Each structure stands twice: as structure tokens, then as C-alpha cells.
Amino acid sequence: MSTNQETRGFQSEVKQLLQLMIHSLYSNKEIFLRELISNASDAADKLRFKALSNPALYEGDGELRVRVSFDETLGTLTISDNGIGMNREQVIDHLGTIAKSGTKEFLNSLGTDQAKDSQLIGQFGVGFYSAFIVADKVTVKTRAAGETQAVLWESAGEGDYTVADIEKATRGTDVILHLREEEKEFLSEWRLREIIGKYSDHIGLPVEIQTTEYNEEGKASGQKWEKINKAQALWTRSKNEISDEEYQEFYKHLSHDYNDSLIWAHNKVEGKQEYTSLLYVPAKAPWDLFNRDQKHGLKLYVQRVFIMDDAEVFMPNYLRFMRGLLDTNDLPLNVSREILQENKITASLRAALTKRALQLLEKLAKDDQAKYQTFWNEFGLVLKEGVGEDFANKQQIASLFRFASTQTDSSEQTVSLADYVGRMKEGQKAIYFLTADSYVAAKNSPHLELFNKKGIEVLLLSDRIDEWVVGHLTEFDGKPLQSITKSDLDLGDLADKEQEESQKAQQAEFGSFLERAQSYFGERVKKVVLTHRLTDTPAVVSTDNDEMTTQMAKLFAAMGQKAPEVKYTFELNPDHRMVKKIADLTDETKFNDWIELLFEQALLAERGSLENPAAFIKRMNKLLG
């Protein structure tokens, strides 16, 4: 009998998620059982951990398990566990709301593309709500370990749910699915065995199914519980015994991802330290990858006992996309997040796991370029953070980077620094790069003209973080990285000696013109000079090596920080007819208008915008009129 009953409305995000999920995931509806068994397994893990300090929570029943049963007459399927259970407040928090920051933004990002939405929802993690894919009503009966009051939760998956106090003799949770008429296929022992074998064989505790016993005459004589999975934690088994399918299903259990992982590494270390690690590289970025409030990390086990989810201290922030677990014998069972932060063992494990993760990415890049490209497209921006965070592994991290390049004529980031170095021209001493707002802007930059003419490859960097990256990554494989937008650009042995001699002569010829232009601009530009880097364009702007670049100034602005004003060097192409024409002008007003127009054009090419575009248009119309 139930008491203290109340009906509550779902959080709006839950209602939206339920509707989207039911329609988007229906083609793979059997995953509901994987999700519910996975939740039951987590509940058992949490009880084991809490019982370390309070064994009375076992209530005399320390044999933890998950049980699956069905009733053909009632049309119900029940998943039961004797894990940690929930009290009334926890039921409302966990089943009536989604306690994930950014949920609203995530749901708003979903559109009408069902295939795409199903992938996104899979990344979000469907969990308990997957029950509504096959059920038109779900009943939950639960009692928290160590408490006497049990709770009933019930909903048809629409606008509201009911919660009430009930009696329940045993701790743990029963999830009862009232199946839709068209979903009665799941009221079959054979079908349930098939699904559990496929998705939950790796669960580290017994999954039992209610089966019929038969006597010697072949007649049904009663019901019994039969264990139908291996019930051995997958990571404790030998690698040789585990199939790829089992590794992938364990990944989905661990991460609640809807997709297979790209690659994994399963390692057991013995000696000074003893631990087992199982690391996975996902194929799709989680929707909250850039949410700083969201914890990302490995599952931590100590001596096979679950301790915590998202133990972020074992992976650096730039590897926060890695999924997996660590099972160690070297930490105490009562370890806390605070203890982990200050622990020498933690630091040693973190260094080892970081190295293992980077080696895994190197293996993926070497063995399967297509899969690595998938990884890079999803997680490249995050990995780039590593050159500023992890000095010890900087070169190894940089070797994993991929860039667009003038060599490939494509915006796809496929070129590694090793590829570039391998193609460097004889006499070339630097790795040349260009940063811009977009690939199109980079590809069409006038700064490339000389390099295109000489056939020198340039890396085209257009991610917002790239300017920060090259600030930390000054060399690779002994070769300095050099921006081609710097005023003191040095081509070394690749320079054209004849052109340099010609330019010296032109310097004398254009001397008074340069002084005149410098006088007009005054403090607005650092200096006005002739340049050898242009072939088709009359002018560009550049910055000195010690000056903040345009892209860095934009990065500051995007973060809401005030950046120092960028002072440019104004470089003019003495072979361009427009420059020659302006140099010959004697009318001061016309000279000022034309030189200003050239400067504005150069600024527009460099920055993509002007502070006063209306004045630019007015000036251009005046000169064209």
C-alpha cells in the first residue's frame, strides 16, 4: 500500500529528451536493456564502496546481482538489483530531472535529422529514460541501503510522474516496464538471453534470468534464477580471451556512448606499481566536451572495488576525451578526490597513463589514417591544448597534430609536422605557417604570393586556438616554426639574391615616397617599407616578431580581454603599377587618399574587417569616380 503520494511535473528538458529519444533510438531499441543493466551494475558498485566504511549497509545480503524477469500475462519486464537503492529525494533528483549542466543548450542543438539526432542523443547518454523506447509506463520500486522507507515512482513518459512511499522488504531497485503491445518480443527468455549475452556479458557481477525448471518427465516444476553472464570484470581477464565485440560492448557500458570506440589499450602492470588500465579513444566528441563545469576522467577501482567516476586527476585536461578505467592496488580503499590531488602515487600513475594514451594515438595514426582523421576532426582542438599544458610530452603531442597546407589544396587538416619536414626544400631551415580566421582567408592571403612562386609549402592554420599553439610550439624536430606574416621574414638560403640587390636599388629610387607615406601615417604604423614578398598585390601589413599578431588580438577580444593595440609595418610592392602611380602623385590630397586606400585594403586582407568600413567605401567611390 502506498502513502504520501504526489504527482509532479517533469523538468522540461526531460519531456523533450523522452520524445526525441523514443523516436530517434527506436531502430536500435534493444539497447534499453543494456542501459538498465548498466545502471543496476553501477548501483552495486556504489553499495560496495559505501559498505567499506559501513558494512551494515549489506543488511546480511552481500551477494550482489542483477535479476531479469518477465510476466507474459501482465506484459511486464522487470530489472532488479540489490545495490545502493534510492530514497525519495534521490528518486526525484535522478528520475525527474537531468542534473547535467548545458542540457538545455544540447537539446536545442538537435534538429529534424533523425540519424544525426540518434548519434547526438547516444553521446548524451540515455540511461534510465531508454525504458520508454519500449514501455508505455514504467514503475520503479526502490529502497536505499540502510533506510526503512521505500519509494514508488511511476510515469507514462509524458508530462508528469507520481511518487509515493511504499514498503519494500529488500534494499535496491526494481524497474518494471509495462511493454507496449508491439514490444512483446521482449517477453521471451530466448530473446532476453540473446540481448544480455550481446551487451552485458562483461558486467562484473552476476546477471540472472528467471527460467523454468523441468522434472524428469519434462514437465514444468517451478522457477529458478540462472546466471547467464561470465560475471567477471572484463579488465581482470586475459586480453587473449576477450573479443573485439566484448571490448566494444564494455566501452558502451562504461561510457554510455552509442558508437563503437576507435581503438583501445588494455594493460596490466606489475612491479614497483601494480595496476590495470583499459583506455578507449571515442569516435565522437561528447556534447559537453568544452563545458568546463563537466567532469571528465577515468573510472577508478582499487583492488577491483569501484571508488569513483570521472577521476580526472589521472589524465591531463587535454586528454579529457579519453574513456576507460584504472584498477590499482597502490591506493587505499578510502581514497578521496582530495587525497588523490596530493598523492605521489597519483602523479606517477598519471604520467604512465598519459604516456599510454599518447602511444595509443600514435598507433592509431600509424595503423589507420582514416580512423585517425575521424579522431582529429572530433578532438584535434582539445589535443592542441597539450603543447601549453604538458612540456615533457610537447614534441610527442605536436607529432599528432594535423594541418591544412598549400601542398594539399584542401581545407581538410591532414598534414603532420613530420610530413612537412620530410618535404622541406634543400636549404629550407624553418617550418612556415600562416594563421587566419578561416581556411579561405588563409589560402587567399597575399602573404603566400612569394611562397607560391617559389613552391615553398606553408601550413594554413585557421582554428581559433592556433595562434596560442604556435606561441607555445616554437620548434619541431629541431626546425623553428616561423610565421610568414612577420615583417622580419627570413628565407635564409631560399632568398633570391638578385631580387635583394634589385630591391636595394629601388630603396633609393622610392626613398622620398616612403618618407612621404611615413609622414602621412605618423604613429599609426610602425614603419613603411618596400617588400619582396608580393607578386600580384600592391601592399600588405605585417608585425614584428615581438609584436602581438592580428589573430592573437582577436583571441583576446573573443575572451573579453583588452589586447594591446597592434602596430603594423606597412609593406609596399615597388613593382606594382598602383604603387608606382601613387609614388608619382604630386597632389597631396590625392596622394593621401590613395595611400590610405592601399593601407585599408591591406588591413582588410589581414583582419577581415575595418573599424570604419563606411569611410573606406566612401573613399573608394571617390577615387573611382
From Swiss-Prot:
Gene3D superfamilies, sorted: 3.30.230.80, 3.40.50.11260, Heat shock protein 90, C-terminal domain (1.20.120.790), Histidine kinase-like ATPase, C-terminal domain (3.30.565.10)
Region A, annotated ranges: 1-337
Chain residue ranges for the region called C: 555-625
Protein origin, superkingdom: Bacteria
GO MF term list: ATP binding; ATP hydrolysis activity; ATP-dependent protein folding chaperone; unfolded protein binding
Main location: cytoplasm
Keyword list, A-Z: ATP-binding, Chaperone, Cytoplasm, Nucleotide-binding, Stress response
GO cellular component: cytoplasm
Parts of the chain that traverse the membrane: none
Subcellular localization(s) per the UniProt record: Cytoplasm
Region (B): 338-554
One Pfam assignment: HATPase_c_3
Biological role: Molecular chaperone. Has ATPase activity.
Complex formation: Homodimer.
Similarity annotation: Belongs to the heat shock protein 90 family.
Name assigned to this protein: Chaperone protein HtpG
Taxonomic lineage: Bacteria, Pseudomonadati, Pseudomonadota, Gammaproteobacteria, Pasteurellales
Gene name, Swiss-Prot/TrEMBL: htpG
